């Protein structure tokens, strides 16, 4: 029963990737390993086999361990719906919307829930790799902390601090984090981990030695910048406006398929487009530009944590006009979950938006959507999962996937996330889209495996950790 906490100097320091790599590396050594994150704030989520909802990063980390997702891996999930409120998901079940202040009022109860989940995992696994949240150095939050030093204190965890050197100032980040926390928390810090290093490590070593001389804490690993990591990236990392997703590999034929993914302000499960991006000849770009929407061969309207708000944004930016012109021209559009709902005739949402009257959608599908307090959580055996409050109340459209979603000649809508990760389904879809988009020179690759690509990237991370972090020493130091 060994466990430790991987915290970060900042958000996006690379904690999730490091934990995924540790999970894979330790699992390859024959250990029974589980991931854990007490509290995650993310609109990227996954569904467990028993119908619970957790952060997608923890689902990936579980996959790295060879495990199916469990609510114990992420007992508290916050899904931001606005700048001030988030939906609170506790042990897989949505409990309502909370403000930052009201969330703090529940911290004692939530800390107990997190500790119970972690202790349950510690009883069942050889090693539990815990991930912190944001920065552990927010002293204004320490008294009610659930995920960082508060968890480490409650469960007696050693702590390793990850810093992103690619941003610059990593030594100051390490020093400041160490110095600002109190003595008891400081004593838990067992090592620093430099992440995303480029160049000659010997040039960095004098600085690391100076840091150790000042603080008495060693740097246990200098992890390299790994090019080409893109599958299952967290939140804003993978959906930057203008960014191309994935490798944009050369086409097998004479033409590419250009996919414009609309970067909604409250985009959720943005990872849905990654399966398309893994295909040779498919270029997926995040955009908010109406011209890009008009020119693309396929437009994807992804999920949203604020469907009505993001629909209003589409209209205010002119993107909705470009989408409607595509629909009139019968050029392919794919809506996923919230994106599908926006494509419908009417949306009645008293749950997430608090709207008292139905709102007109884009009207591409003759479908009415009504939001219900009870969230639909389904993990499909044949691929994909559903996470949504909105339900189809009326439809005259042909279903798309089984008896779900909607399909017209050139438009596709579904509540199902992850459907295109199924290789055969993705190939069929791309063949249809290339025909509709009049791209006869695009050739669908016959054997691309999204799962193989995911495993390849996890192994690359694990290999880097094995090479640059003494895992024998790490395991020996754990209690």
Curated annotation (Swiss-Prot):
Annotated metabolic or biological route of this protein: Cofactor biosynthesis; adenosylcobalamin biosynthesis
GO biological process, one term: cobalamin biosynthetic process
MF-aspect GO terms: ABC-type vitamin B12 transporter activity; catalytic activity
Keywords on record: Cobalamin biosynthesis, Glutamine amidotransferase
The GATase cobBQ-type domain, residue ranges: 256-425
Active-site residues annotated for this sequence: 337 (nucleophile), 417
One Pfam assignment: GATase_3
InterPro entries: Class_I_gatase-like, CobQ/CobB/MinD/ParA_Nub-bd_dom, CobQ_GATase1, CobQ_N, CobQ_synth, GATase_3, P-loop_NTPase
Record-stated family: Belongs to the CobB/CobQ family. CobQ subfamily.
HAMAP family: CobQ (MF_00028)
Role noted for this protein: Catalyzes amidations at positions B, D, E, and G on adenosylcobyrinic A,C-diamide. NH(2) groups are provided by glutamine, and one molecule of ATP is hydrogenolyzed for each amidation.
Annotated protein name in UniProt: Cobyric acid synthase
Protein's organism: Corynebacterium diphtheriae (strain ATCC 700971 / NCTC 13129 / Biotype gravis)
Lineage of the organism: Bacteria, Bacillati, Actinomycetota, Actinomycetes, Mycobacteriales
Gene name tied to this protein: cobQ
């Amino acid at each position: 029963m060994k466990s430790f906490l991987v915290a970060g100097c900042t958000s996006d320091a690379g904690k999730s990737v490091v934990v995924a790599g540790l999970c894979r590396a330790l699992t390859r050594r024959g250990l029974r390993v589980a991931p854990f994150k007490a509290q995650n704030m993310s609109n990227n989520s996954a569904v467990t086999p028993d119908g619970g909802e957790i952060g997608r990063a923890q689902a990936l980390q579980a996959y790295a361990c060879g495990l199916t997702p469990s609510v114990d891996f992420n007992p508290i999930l916050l899904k931001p719906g606005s700048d001030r409120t988030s939906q609170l998901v506790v042990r897989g079940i949505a409990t309502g919307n909370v403000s930052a202040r009201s969330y703090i009022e529940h911290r004692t109860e939530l800390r107990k829930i997190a500790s119970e989940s972690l202790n349950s995992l510690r009883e069942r696994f050889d090693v539990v790799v815990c991930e912190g949240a944001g920065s552990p150095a927010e002293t204004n939050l320490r008294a009610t902390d659930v995920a960082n030093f508060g968890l480490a204190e409650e469960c007696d965890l050693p702590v390793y601090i990850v810093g992103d050197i690619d941003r610059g100032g990593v030594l100051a980040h390490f020093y400041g984090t160490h110095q600002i926390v109190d003595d008891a928390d400081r004593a838990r810090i067992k090592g620093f981990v430099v992440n995303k290093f480029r160049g000659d490590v010997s040039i960095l070593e004098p600085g690391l030695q100076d840091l150790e001389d000042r603080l008495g804490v060693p740097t246990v690993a200098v992890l390299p910048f790994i090019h080409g990591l893109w599958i299952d990236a967290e939140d804003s990392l993978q959906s930057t406006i203008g960014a191309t997703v994935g490798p944009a590999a050369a086409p097998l034929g004479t033409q590419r398929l250009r996919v414009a993914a609309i970067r909604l302000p409250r985009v959720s499960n943005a990872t849905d487009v990654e399966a398309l991006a893994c295909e040779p000849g498919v270029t997926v770009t995040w955009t908010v530009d109406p011209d890009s929407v008009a020119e693309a061969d396929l437009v994807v309207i992804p999920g949203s944590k604020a469907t009505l708000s993001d629909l209003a944004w589409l209209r205010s930016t002119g993107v909705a006009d470009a989408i409607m012109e595509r629909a009139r021209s019968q050029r392919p559009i794919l809506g996923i979950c919230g994106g599908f709902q926006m494509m419908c005739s009417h949306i009645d949402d008293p749950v997430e938006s608090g709207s008292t009257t139905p709102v007109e959608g884009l009207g591409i599908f003759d479908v009415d959507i009504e939001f219900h307090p009870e969230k639909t959580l389904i993990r499909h055996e044949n691929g994909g999962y559903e996470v949504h409050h909105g339900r189809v109340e009326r439809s005259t459209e042909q279903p798309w996937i089984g008896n779900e979603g909607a399909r017209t000649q050139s438009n596709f809508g579904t509540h199902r996330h992850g459907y295109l990760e199924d290789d055969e389904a993705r190939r069929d879809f791309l063949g249809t889209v290339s025909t509709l988009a009049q791209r006869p020179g695009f050739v669908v690759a016959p054997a691309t495996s999204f799962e193989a690509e995911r495993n390849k990237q996890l192994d690359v991370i694990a290999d880097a950790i094995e090479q640059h972090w003494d895992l024998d020493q790490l395991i020996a130091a754990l209690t």
